[in-house]
Design a protein with these regions (language model features):
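Conserved beta-loop-beta/alpha segment of the NTase-like Rossmann-fold superfamily
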Residues: 6-66
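Conserved small-residue-rich
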Residues: 139-185
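A feature for the membrane-embedded catalytic helix bundles of lipid/isoprenoid biosynthetic enzymes
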Residues: 58-158, 227-353
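Short amphipathic alpha-helical coupling elements at transmembrane boundaries
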Residues: 155-162, 209, 213, 223, ...
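Membrane-embedded alpha-helical segments that form the functional core of polytopic membrane enzymes
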Residues: 168-221
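Extended, compositionally biased accessory segments flanking or bridging domains
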Residues: 1-2
């Protein structure tokens, strides 16, 4: 590729020269814009010239994929990419990016989002965009705490991390430490400090991914750490709950409840994995019903809140039984939905071969 540096020549002339020098398609971006990284990748995969646009008038932002064959149609006196895009569109030398072909579904967020590109002209616009991108990075299907309780805590933490350059992997490592620090505390019956660590980890689990996506520092190791933590830690928590309640052998019903809770949890993760392979995406993003049910099913934030409420009521034992039953019902629900959507539904609801 070629980077167009500020020089005495007008943008149009410099862009022409860059295209001729490149000898192949170039993705042309305005460094003053905030651009969806998915859009950059998608433009780089195009075989012909096209333009992506968002906004109107002075707030209109454009990004282009240009083939050297259109260089002669670029106005030599063009001063910005908007003028370049307008001229090329007027002559029919470029087409508008096909929105239907853009991969809008984001697996990590379990939702579809159109591509975004913004012109950042002042501090007020920047603050508005920060808030909008923050909400855009919330999962389409998630639990009640993550959706309604955590945002007032997560938003200032995300801003702090982005402003001071704290890498999301650092946030993930702190959350891992908190997640496993809760285990011996609970096992020792120190419920308060155990839940302080657990809820701290839960909040940070909403922070690291957003920092990564907002600062474009998403990494494979970060994803492995984040998703690995999400899947691995719950069984340790559940076993620690039983120990904290004084259950130390299979002769104790609470001990067996914890064992069954772990079995149900592992089986549930297996079922969800099968569902994703069959459907082609996360089960919870399949239908509005699945999205709504995701807010209350037996996942970490819901189960630990049930347990915390039970302990506050002086009913830790019944609380563990309730959590086990809820995890079992969740497994049955996911099994039924996987059977229907993945195996019994009409052909068009199954993933493409």
């Amino acid at each position: 590729g070629a980077r167009i540096e500020t020089a005495n020549l007008a943008l149009g002339k410099r862009l022409r020269a860059a295209l001729w020098a490149a000898g192949g398609p170039l993705v042309v971006l305005d460094g003053a814009n905030v651009i969806d990284p998915r859009l950059i990748r998608f433009l780089g995969q195009q075989s012909g010239s096209c333009v992506a646009m968002r906004g109107e008038n002075a707030a209109r932002a454009v990004a282009l994929c240009l083939d050297p064959t259109v260089a002669d149609a670029i106005p030599a006196d063009a001063t910005d990419l908007r003028a370049v895009a307008d001229a090329l569109l007027a002559t029919g030398r470029v087409s508008v990016l096909d929105e239907a072909a853009f991969p809008a579904y984001i697996d990590k967020l379990r939702r579809s989002l159109p591509y975004w590109i913004y012109t950042v002209s002042d501090a007020a616009t920047r603050r508005t965009l920060e808030r909008q991108l923050f909400w855009d990075n919330y999962k389409g299907s998630t639990d009640l705490l993550t959706r309604y309780v955590y945002p007032p805590l997560v938003w200032p933490m995300v801003r702090f991390c982005t402003r001071f350059g704290i890498h999301p992997n650092v946030v993930t490592i702190v959350s891992i430490i908190l997640a496993f620090a809760a285990v011996p505390l609970w096992a020792d019956g120190q419920w308060f400090w155990g839940f302080v660590c657990a809820y701290g980890m839960s909040v940070l689990d909403s922070v690291d991914g957003k920092v990564a996506r907002l600062t474009l520092t998403d990494s494979k190791i970060g994803n492995v750490l984040d998703h690995g933590l999400d899947q691995v830690h719950p069984p340790f928590w559940y076993y620690a709950w039983a120990l904290g309640l004084g259950a130390t052998s299979a002769a104790d019903p609470l001990y067996m409840a914890a064992i069954w809770l772990i079995v149900f949890y592992v089986a549930d993760r297996v079922v969800l994995g099968i569902a994703k392979r069959r459907i082609g995406h996360a089960l919870h993003s399949s239908t509005p019903l699945d999205e709504r049910v995701r807010s209350i099913i037996a996942r970490r934030n819901i189960t630990m809140t049930i347990m915390a409420a039970a302990l506050l009521a002086g009913a830790g034992g019944p609380g563990l039984i309730i959590v086990t039953a809820w995890q079992g019902l969740t497994l049955l629900w996911h099994g039924a939905r996987t059977a229907w959507l993945g195996f019994l539904s009409p052909q068009e609801m199954r993933p493409e071969a």
